[in-house]
Amino acid sequence: MISVKNDRIIVDRKAVEKFVDKKYAYFSTIGATRTLKLAGGTITVSGGNYGYDMDKKKQVKSLVKALETGKDHNLKVDYEQKGWGVAKGNDIGNTYLEVSIGRQHVWMVRNGKIVLSTPVVTGNVAEGNGTPYGTFSLMYKTSPATLEGENNDGSKYKTKVNYWMPFFAGCGFHDAPWRGSFGGSTYLRNGSHGCVNMPPSQAFALYGIVEAGMPVIVHG
């Protein structure tokens, strides 16, 4: 990785890049398989866009610079994206949103305590619009919002909601005042286009306590 020529330290950048590539999987957790003890029980889930992502270019640059000095350094890992918990071990932390598809339920946990618990309706399984599984980052929140997209028959839809909190592509949490009930098996044939439909009062409550970047764990 390093050599000395004419009293000058020469760093093999390609060797450094290979070293960083090997360490990438250790320090990056996006899409990882996680076994977590959550409000709804112990679950295993993989996929999603949440987690730590090492900035390889920046890491190579800082490592080369450190090696060129010929001195000992305590280098920090350079991250392009960070999670809410520690980088290794539990990168979720103790504040998160949990969605159980099988139980049709959402829990909001803050500092290890359940602060919101509600039945919901998720994506329509029969029409292939099931809510995606994985660990995601809450993108943002806005109120009100107009949700637009296509139905399975190609027709367009435009729905106004009071509270919109997306976590992946067009999927997110929102109020669904048109539904008379939540939970149960409704999602199997009469679910959403992929979103997590919530009772209006619960969507209002959730909107007031969530933050962008918060982990969202969707499992079976």
What would you call each of these model-derived segments?
Residues 1-159, 163, 210-212, 217-220:
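Surface-exposed, secretory/extracytoplasmic low-complexity segments enriched in Ser/Thr/Asn/Gly/Pro
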Residues 162-209, 214-218:
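Active-site scaffold segments
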